[in-house]
Amino acid sequence: MAGLPDKDKLIRNFSRCLNWEEKYLYVIELGAQLPPLTEQQRQPDNLISGCQSQVWIAMSTSTEGQVVFAGDSDAAIVKGLVVVVFILYQGLTPQQIIDLDVRPFFADLALSQHLTPSRSQGLEAMIRAIRAKAAVLKAG
């Protein structure tokens, strides 16, 4: 996902936001950078249940064994949250994704306390789905 910040830069950029409104706008800007999904990726298997908005997450592995992400949402803020999650898992293998708890990163970004309960539940559903898909990729 060329052009997206890495984890450290993401945290730095969030810390530079003066208030929650700026963070919200930054998340929306991140979402706008997601390339569109193909029709093949926009299949029911990639639709994440537990999200109020429609969210698709497709995962595959590169020749180096790293997970490659593609995703989309019909809601701008949720699309941005998809990108944030992808950034946190970027460059990892399926096993590393299974082992990594990204929740502390959301605490570092001060995102968790500013999301509505339904968005927090959706974020949790995305994380669970990514870890489950990583387990399937690992199993081959």
Swiss-Prot record:
Keywords: Cytoplasm. Gene3D superfamilies: 3.90.1010.10. One of its GO terms (cellular component) is cytoplasm. Signal peptide: none annotated. SUPFAM superfamilies: SufE/NifU. The active site is at 51 (cysteine persulfide intermediate). The keyword DNA damage does not apply. GO terms for biological process: iron-sulfur cluster assembly; sulfur compound metabolic process. It is found in: Cytoplasm. InterPro entries: Cysteine_desulfuration_SufE, Fe-S_metab-assoc_dom. Pfam families: SufE (PF02657). Pathway: Cofactor biosynthesis; iron-sulfur cluster biosynthesis. Participates in cysteine desulfuration mediated by SufS. Cysteine desulfuration mobilizes sulfur from L-cysteine to yield L-alanine and constitutes an essential step in sulfur metabolism for biosynthesis of a variety of sulfur-containing biomolecules. Functions as a sulfur acceptor for SufS, by mediating the direct transfer of the sulfur atom from the S-sulfanylcysteine of SufS, an intermediate product of cysteine desulfuration process. Belongs to the SufE family. PANTHER family: CYSTEINE DESULFURATION PROTEIN SUFE (PTHR43597:SF3), SULFUR ACCEPTOR PROTEIN CSDE (PTHR43597). Homodimer. Interacts with SufS. This is Cysteine desulfuration protein SufE. It comes from Yersinia enterocolitica serotype O:8 / biotype 1B (strain NCTC 13174 / 8081). The gene is sufE.
